Amino acid sequence: MIAPTMRRSDLHAEPEALHPSLWRASQLARAGARCIDTGHPALSAQLPGGGWPTGTLVDLMLQQPGIGEMRLLRPALAAVASRRIVLLQPPHPPQALALAALGVQPSQLIWLRAGTTADVLWAAEQVLKSGSCGALLCWQQQVRPESLRRLHLAAQGGDTLFFMLRPLAAGHDTSPAPLRLALRPQAGGIGIEFVKRRGPLREAPLFLPLVSYLHHHRHAPVDRPASAPVAARGLQSQLVH
């Protein structure tokens, strides 16, 4: 069978008009799904669709936990806080003060802990497949590429904000995530390196100033754990509430 000849008009069409996975290398791609505003105009201007993509894997590689990643995500989490927000295997228990600063009510939070990597990945997949959560933040040291692909596929079936938070070294590993950012602490804010995005290469890191939680909550109560963790294998009952 002879392949159909490409029409002359196709040569001048926007790449996205030919296939949604295509874009010009000199331009940011159009968003293939709904995006959530980052709340940081300088960052949004550098992302396809002008925000965090939903229904897909987003890789955040951290120099170390606690460098400002939660403050970076605060506006987006507040935007989806009408639905459950899942913290899976966070390095520290979530604190009431931090949740208040994020605009998240403790009743909307599910804090999950798992004993093994397999349980972490299983729980993440169940959250994504349920379609009932506004955001999933999953902390993990090492994840095999095939496991990332499985989670990415599960994410595409819904509109959950899905962030995988891993060490900087993970930036050298392959990942199906269309957006990968490396985060490093800087005085007064955070430095963001665009490891991968659907658009032109950006070599210079982006600096974002971040305001401390305590700046907004000077009279907040003393930090305390927001709730007890849920075992990963006991997740199903939490998702149907």
Model-derived segments and their meaning:
Residues 1-87, 101, 106, 197-200, ...:
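Detector for small/aliphatic-rich hydrophobic stretches
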Residues 43, 60, 109, 136, ...:
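Conserved RecA-like P-loop NTPase ATPase core
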Residues 72-76, 98, 123, 147-151, ...:
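A short acidic, amphipathic alpha-helical/loop segment
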Residues 83-86, 96-97, 102, 118, ...:
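Glycine-biased, small-residue-rich flexible motifs in mid-sequence functional cores and linkers
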Residues 84-143:
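Long, charge-dense
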Residues 128-172, 177:
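A contiguous pocket-lining binding segment that forms or flanks enzyme active sites
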Residues 166-233:
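Phosphate-binding/switch region of NTP-binding enzymes
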